[in-house]
């Protein structure tokens, strides 16, 4: 059985990608990160996901990205913006962008993949994010894949490492539709940047607005609870 390393955050996208990798019959090795983010609830949500998809092993890596901040998710001095509708969302890189986060995460996943001999790495980047987050674009994924195959022992031995981004051409609406077909229980996910201590989502941060809009377009009630 082929091995995969799946980046798993506890949100809609990574949960859907986990289901896709499971459907493709990979032996899944998941990796999550405690990087100093405001939303620690996402690390609790992954527990149910790894049970459902028979994840072989799950690594939670501690990284202190608060050490240099630069993002509303890792710096308490930067406020999380709140919105009333999807039409208010910014068309520029938002303050919730974490500098180089996907590059850092993929680098850890790459190291893990080399250790266990996995040639497939899965990440949940997609179209809806690519407009605002530079490390969610197709050209970024292609460039990273090219780099890893000249920078690793596996790569120079001809054991090509592939970075899979199966959601790359999908909107959030399409991602949810795909996940539902695969049986993903989105009750076990969270997207909110500032959930309460009892895991209630705020409903008006960028992530919540996009999530609620996507469920609405699918004519489905979001199964998680909001304030």
Swiss-Prot record:
NCBIfam families cross-referenced by the UniProt entry: 7-cyano-7-deazaguanine synthase QueC
The name this protein goes by in its record: 7-cyano-7-deazaguanine synthase
UniProt-listed InterPro entries: QueC, Rossmann-like_a/b/a_fold
Cofactor-binding details, from the entry: Binds 1 zinc ion per subunit.
Gene assigned in the entry: queC
Molecular function terms from GO: ATP binding; ligase activity, forming carbon-nitrogen bonds; zinc ion binding
One Pfam assignment: QueC
GO biological process per UniProt: queuosine biosynthetic process
Reactions listed under catalytic activity: 7-carboxy-7-deazaguanine + NH4(+) + ATP = 7-cyano-7-deazaguanine + ADP + phosphate + H2O + H(+)
Cofactor(s) needed for function: Zn(2+)
Function: Catalyzes the ATP-dependent conversion of 7-carboxy-7-deazaguanine (CDG) to 7-cyano-7-deazaguanine (preQ(0)).
Enzyme class: ligase
Record: residues binding ATP: 8-18
Gene3D superfamilies: HUPs
Positions bound to Zn(2+): 192, 202, 205, 208
Pathway of action: Purine metabolism; 7-cyano-7-deazaguanine biosynthesis
Keywords: ATP-binding, Ligase, Metal-binding, Nucleotide-binding, Queuosine biosynthesis, Zinc
CDD domains registered for this protein in UniProt: QueC-like
Leader sequence residues: none
Enzyme Commission designation: 6.3.4.20
The family this protein is said to belong to: Belongs to the QueC family.
